[in-house]
Amino acid sequence: MNVQYQAFTPPHLLNNTRRSPTRNISSLSSTMSGRKRKAEDDGSAGDDDRMSASPSASPAVLPRPAPRGMKRMRTNISGRPLPLPRLLETLSPDDMRNLLQSICQRHPDISNEIVTTAPRPSIQSTLEVLAKYEASFQAAFPFGGRASSDYAYNRVRQQLDELLDSLKDFTPHFLPPNEQQPATSLTFLDGATNIIHRLPNWDTFQHNRHKQEAYEEMAKAWAMVIQEAAKKAGGIQLQYGGWDEKIAKHNEISGGKMQEAVNELRGGLGWMGAETSNSAAGAPADAMSIRQQLLSGNYGAGSPASIGAW
């Protein structure tokens, strides 16, 4: 038996006609990318589910609402006029007064409404206005020289006229029947008369006519108020307000130009008017009125004391 030996050939060197099936590389890559994308989508969906399942544990900061009362700045900024309240805030008292006067001149109905609705001027506010006119008058005097000279008079003539005109305009407001309270009228007249006292006596006689006329008008105003005050409660406002002494003092400072007011006081209150006229004419200093004796506790000190049973 003859055995034939064949040479051994390794398998990888054999001529193998059976081939493995070929694969499409592009389809493989697209398949893998699709699987990867699906896995990512599934993972993100899980994260969303976990986030939505426990919102209380989320560290996210919620937006805060803007506090009330704060206005947001307008994004469409453009030029525009001021609102009326803001415009009025920028006006000075003089500008406001000039504006109102101009409007009232064009619209008389508005003028009447302002007069009827505006608050009544008080004594303090009115005297403050008069004090401003007086301060302007005093500031107009030139430096050096005599304050009563003709040169000084010419320098302050305009301010003097403004002061006297303001007195003429304000005084009737505090007279009856517009003012019903005698105490209010008397208090204003007291302050206004002191302003006239402080006016200078000019070297030229003709220049003093302004002051003389002011005294005459003020004396008439005093007489009117005294007459009305004497009708109310027996003139108690005059008796216990010390107005008899004040009127006598005004008459003394003015050189007797307030005599009309003194005469009205004498006629309206009788004995009190006599006491006032005597003191104004230069009565002895130890002559005291009954009211003064009562206030000082000396009433009846000069009368003899009664003796015996009562």
Swiss-Prot record:
Residues 14-33 have a biased composition (Polar residues). One of its GO terms (biological process) is protein transport. Residues 1-86 are annotated as: Disordered. The lineage of its organism: Eukaryota, Fungi, Dikarya, Ascomycota, Pezizomycotina. Residues 52-63 have a biased composition (Low complexity). Transmembrane segments: none annotated. This is Tethering factor for nuclear proteasome sts1. GO terms for molecular function: proteasome binding. It is found in: Cytoplasm; Nucleus. Involved in ubiquitin-mediated protein degradation. Regulatory factor in the ubiquitin/proteasome pathway that controls the turnover of proteasome substrates. Targets proteasomes to the nucleus and facilitates the degradation of nuclear proteins. Binds the proteasome. Disulfide bonds: none annotated. It holds the Pfam family Cut8. Keywords: Cytoplasm, Nucleus, Protein transport, Transport. One of its GO terms (cellular component) is nuclear membrane. Belongs to the cut8/STS1 family.
